[in-house]
């Protein structure tokens, strides 16, 4: 239903991520041109063993492997664990990189605000900086750290 609503409103499916997929939904999502994301959860929804089989069957185009750290049983390290399992099961490194990293970066980076350099070359912390004239501070002295480790 959500894909139909997106299409009815003229959204470009190649710019829409449909998450929480499984083996039963992935084909329809990909066939309609959307990006299929899979949140890997232990014991529920999508597991990493099943994710390996999805990538073997459908390839790495328009597929994103993600994880969660929410109120239920979840594993924030599910993506690297799934990537490792993919490699062990013979999936090519380039396909692992695409599904577990690059595809997400490509789509979420289209807004121009999320760039790989943000975490590959992080800046030091400077709490004296303001965002829209607002600060995270509540009366305390700003923390300013350099990128240097002394």
Specify the residue positions occupied by each region the protein language model found.
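Divalent metal-binding pocket/active-site signature
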Residues: 1-24
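Short acidic/histidine-rich active-site segments
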Residues: 60-77
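Generic hydrophobic/aromatic pocket-lining and core-packing "Φ" positions
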Residues: 3, 26-27, 51-52, 83
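A short, acidic, amphipathic alpha-helical segment used as a generic capping/interface helix at domain edges
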Residues: 47-56
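Glycine-enriched alpha-helix->loop->beta-strand junction motifs that scaffold or abut catalytic
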Residues: 6-14, 30-37, 59-62
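Active-site glycine- and acidic-residue-rich loops that bind
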Residues: 17-19, 39-48
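Mid-to-C-terminal alpha-helical segments outside catalytic/metal-binding sites
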Residues: 80-150
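Short, small-residue-enriched loops and turns at beta-alpha junctions
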Residues: 1, 23-25, 42-46, 70-74
């Amino acid at each position: 239903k959500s894909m139909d609503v997106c299409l009815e409103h003229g959204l470009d499916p190649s710019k829409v991520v449909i998450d929480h997929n499984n083996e039963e939904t992935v084909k329809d999502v990909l066939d309609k041109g959307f990006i299929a994301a899979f949140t890997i959860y232990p014991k529920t929804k999508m597991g990493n063993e099943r994710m390996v089989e999805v990538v073997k069957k459908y390839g790495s185009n328009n597929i994103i492997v993600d994880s969660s750290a929410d109120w239920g049983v979840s594993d924030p390290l599910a993506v690297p664990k799934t990537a490792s399992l993919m490699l062990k099961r013979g999936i090519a490194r380039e396909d692992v990189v695409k599904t577990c990293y690059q595809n997400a970066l490509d789509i979420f980076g289209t807004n121009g605000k999320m760039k790989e350099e943000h975490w590959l070359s992080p800046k030091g912390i400077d709490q004296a900086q303001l965002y829209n004239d607002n600060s995270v501070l509540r009366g305390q002295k700003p923390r300013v750290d350099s990128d240097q480790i002394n």
